[in-house]
């Protein structure tokens, strides 16, 4: 099989169709049948599990071993990795992983490899391509709230821990909503980590180092078109 494409259709590179109604599709990799709102015009389809399998391994290995304490730096390295497409739920994993790794590496909080790995799996299960627009629930926002859920040990019977976790989601989701038009996972990751930085100070009393001079190198790759000057991270020198 040819190497998977990282832009548009993973199989042929064609621009994907975003549908108003779900259709039944079959994953070209594993054969699973399901309903989907996104497809290749030629008929190719890759399910969420197959779409993110290779990237999950890459992201997990990197965030578990990096010593970097600045969350944007961790995320930027991963977003440039060849296994990570321009758009996709892999960015939810990057957000959660970069945030947790930065917090752990700050030395002010202990987070085990097992807890970080389980968080990534939870985020992957709840992040579905296209649902950011269809349902208004972006997996990147879940990445930050899931990190808080792990750190605080939030469960349904708990009060403050669960409330903080939900507030984290709402605040990231609101910031992302103000950054929409068109959708851009790269921008959303940066926005989410910026909110995560503020949340860490507020709820965990941890002030992470943060790079305030991020400039995007992906502006010419967005199949929906770049927001350019409307984006906080736009660079005229973007590839």
Language model feature labels by segment:
Residues 6, 24-27, 37, 44, ...:
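Residues immediately within or flanking Cys/His clusters that coordinate Zn2+
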Residues 61-97, 182:
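Polybasic, low-complexity association/targeting segments
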Residues 1-6, 15-23, 38-41:
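Short, flexible, mixed-charge glycine/proline-rich loop motifs
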Residues 9-12, 27-30, 40, 47-50:
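Short cysteine-rich clusters marking metal-coordination/redox-active sites
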Residues 151, 158-201:
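A structural-propensity feature for long, helix-poor, extended segments
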Residues 14-18, 35, 45, 55:
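Short functional micro-motifs and their immediate structural scaffolds
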Residues 91, 131-150:
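Conserved phosphate/anionic-ligand binding catalytic regions in large, soluble enzymes, centered on
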Residues 37, 77-89, 125-136, 176-181:
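A short glycine/serine-rich beta->alpha loop
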């Amino acid at each position: 099989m040819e190497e998977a494409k990282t832009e548009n259709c993973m199989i042929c590179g064609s621009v994907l169709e975003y549908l108003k109604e779900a259709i039944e599709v079959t994953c070209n990799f594993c054969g699973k049948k399901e309903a989907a709102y996104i497809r290749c015009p030629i008929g190719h389809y890759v399910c969420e599990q197959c779409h993110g399998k290779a990237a999950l391994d890459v992201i997990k290995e990197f965030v578990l071993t990096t010593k970097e304490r600045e969350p944007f730096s961790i995320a930027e390295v991963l977003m440039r990795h060849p296994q990570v497409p321009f758009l996709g739920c892999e960015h939810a994993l990057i957000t959660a992983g970069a945030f947790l790794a930065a917090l752990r590496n700050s030395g002010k909080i202990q987070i085990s490899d097992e807890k970080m790995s389980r968080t990534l799996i939870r985020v992957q299960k709840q992040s579905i391509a296209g649902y950011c627009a269809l349902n208004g629930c972006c997996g990147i926002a879940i990445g930050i709230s899931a990190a808080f859920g792990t750190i605080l040990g939030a469960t349904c019977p708990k009060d403050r821990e669960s409330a903080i976790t939900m507030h984290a989601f709402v605040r990231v989701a609101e910031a992302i909503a103000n950054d929409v038009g068109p959708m851009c996972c790269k921008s959303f990751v940066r926005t989410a980590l910026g909110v995560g930085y503020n949340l860490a100070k507020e709820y965990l009393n941890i002030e992470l180092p943060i790079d305030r001079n991020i400039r995007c190198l992906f502006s010419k790759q967005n199949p929906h078109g770049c927001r350019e000057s409307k984006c906080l991270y736009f660079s005229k020198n973007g590839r």
